[in-house]
UniProtKB/Swiss-Prot annotation:
Gene3D superfamilies: Helix hairpin bin, Tubulin/FtsZ, C-terminal domain, Tubulin/FtsZ, GTPase domain. GTP binds at residues 11, 69, 138, 142-144, 204, 226. One of its GO terms (biological process) is microtubule cytoskeleton organization. The modification Phosphoserine is found at residue 172. Dimer of alpha and beta chains. A typical microtubule is a hollow water-filled tube with an outer diameter of 25 nm and an inner diameter of 15 nM. Alpha-beta heterodimers associate head-to-tail to form protofilaments running lengthwise along the microtubule wall with the beta-tubulin subunit facing the microtubule plus end conferring a structural polarity. Microtubules usually have 13 protofilaments but different protofilament numbers can be found in some organisms and specialized cells. It comes from Bos taurus (Bovine). Mg(2+) binds at residue 69. This is Tubulin beta-6 chain. The gene is TUBB6.
Length: 446
């Protein structure tokens, strides 16, 4: 089977990663000890994508858990699914990265990276046919951002033809942990643009707004935010984990979603978003799901898709529903909002349907959009970056670890280039767009 190796780095990465494993273990009928307690053959049909089967019929996540301090690992280990993971696959330092990208990327992280790569290598050797890697991390801290991007580039060197997929939590002013977040994020995006094939941008600000406005939680905790992230991650990986037709592996998804190699930052969304207590009181219909799924309020990145245009969209519907109805609703949305889809990529909306709904819901829909509006997120980080960098504020923490100011300047201009590339395709009309598309193809053919 087409296996995926999962890596989670840093505090945020480990928290959302562990939640992801809890959710998908539940969906596949795997109990906290790794035993199978499910009731459907579908649960096991593609179980090998994320789990190794041990000789004693135990299912073990194909996961490496990485952090530069022991704290998060301890809480994962003592959590409900702590015994599910292979003990050898916990790799941690003692010092911590102190929210410093340079420590994660160049000093502390660089010392630990080889032992992580050993674990990754071992997991890859157990694979029949490895399709790629997925990393969960945040871009605001030190370990997930600095060491996470270091791991990506090392894995890229060793497995250049495998897909690299990340779930990256972007910093936001509303939920700020550290003052140097804009530095860490800009340096990370600089790496992600070059080294990943698909990046799901998850944004704390958007998650907060969803908890606050839609779920009516007055004081959302990180637990509530992670609950949303895990629902979304479970949704976007559905077609990888259950037998289905469309986007059934990472490469097919990338082919459908990425028209230009640098523009691979996706905006995820999820429906239905109902407060945790009131799920059973809602009867859901396909039109409602479709409507909600495209709603700006349901996006997990704090960008308004109405301020941009969709290059491509993939949607995953889950639950017993009529394929025909789903297709009709999706067409209706495209026709009604045609100005929000670029006209120079025909058929740019793809739909997959999986019969198995997530736990506690009759049906759900997950949205993956490659929208030019994602530039708002990068602009926001860039403005904060420039404000501090102009004054060289806090730079000594980074230069002290051996970094050069030049690197900051490069990262900044790379991110600004990314913003203008998104803008260019947002403004492109059919005639210009097609030319751009052809130019791009010519380069590929050479």
């Amino acid at each position: 089977m087409r296996e995926i190796v999962h890596i989670q780095a840093g505090q945020c990465g480990n928290q959302i990663g562990t939640k992801f494993w809890e959710v998908i273990s539940d969906e596949h009928g795997i109990d906290p000890a790794g035993g199978y307690v499910g009731d459907s053959a579908l649960q096991l049909e593609r179980i090998n994508v994320y789990y190794n089967e041990s000789s004693s019929q135990k299912y073990v996540p194909r996961a490496a858990l990485v952090d530069l301090e022991p704290g998060t690992m301890d809480s994962v280990r003592s959590g409900p699914f702590g015994q599910l993971f292979r003990p050898d696959n916990f790799i941690f330092g003692q010092t911590g990265a102190g929210n410093n990208w340079a420590k994660g990327h160049y000093t502390e992280g660089a010392e630990l990276v080889d032992s992580v790569l050993d674990v990754v290598r071992k997991e890859c050797e157990h694979c029949d046919c490895l399709q790629g890697f997925q990393l969960t991390h945040s871009l605001g801290g030190g370990t997930g951002s600095g060491m996470g991007t270091l791991l990506i580039s090392k894995i890229r060197e060793e497995y250049p033809d495998r897909i690299m997929n990340t779930f990256s939590v972007m910093p936001s002013p509303k939920v700020s942990d550290t003052v140097v977040e804009p530095y860490n994020a800009t340096l990370s995006v600089h790496q992600l643009v070059e080294n990943t094939d698909e990046t799901y941008c998850i944004d704390n600000e958007a998650l907060y707004d969803i908890c606050f406005r839609t779920l009516k939680l007055t004081t959302p905790t990180y637990g509530d935010l992670n609950h949303l992230v895990s629902a979304t991650m479970s949704g976007v990986t559905t077609s990888l984990r259950f037998p289905g037709q469309l986007n059934a592996d990472l490469r097919k998804l990338a082919v459908n979603m990425v028209p230009f190699p640098r523009l691979h930052f996706f905006m995820p969304g999820f429906a239905p978003l109902t407060a945790r207590g009131s799920q059973q009181y809602r009867a859901l219909t396909v039109p409602e799901l479709t409507q909600q799924m495209f709603d700006a309020k349901n996006m997990m990145a704090a960008c308004d898709p109405r301020h941009g245009r969709y290059l491509t969209v993939a949607a995953v519907f889950r639950g017993p529903m009529s394929m025909k109805e789903v297709d009709e609703q999706m067409l209706a949305i495209q026709n009604k909002n045609s100005s929000y889809f670029v006209e120079w990529i025909p058929n740019n909306v793809k739909v997959a349907v999986c019969d198995i709904p997530p736990r506690g819901l009759k049906m759900s829909a997950t949205f993956i959009g490659n929208s030019t509006a994602i530039q708002e997120l990068f602009k926001r980080i860039s403005e904060q970056f420039s404000a501090m960098f102009r004054r060289k504020a806090f730079l000594h923490w980074f230069t002290g670890e051996g970094m050069d100011e030049m690197e900051f300047t490069e990262a900044e201009s790379n991110m600004n280039d990314l913003v203008s590339e998104y803008q260019q395709y947002q403004d492109a009309t059919a005639d210009e767009g097609e030319e751009a598309f052809e130019d791009d193809e010519e380069e590929v053919n050479e």
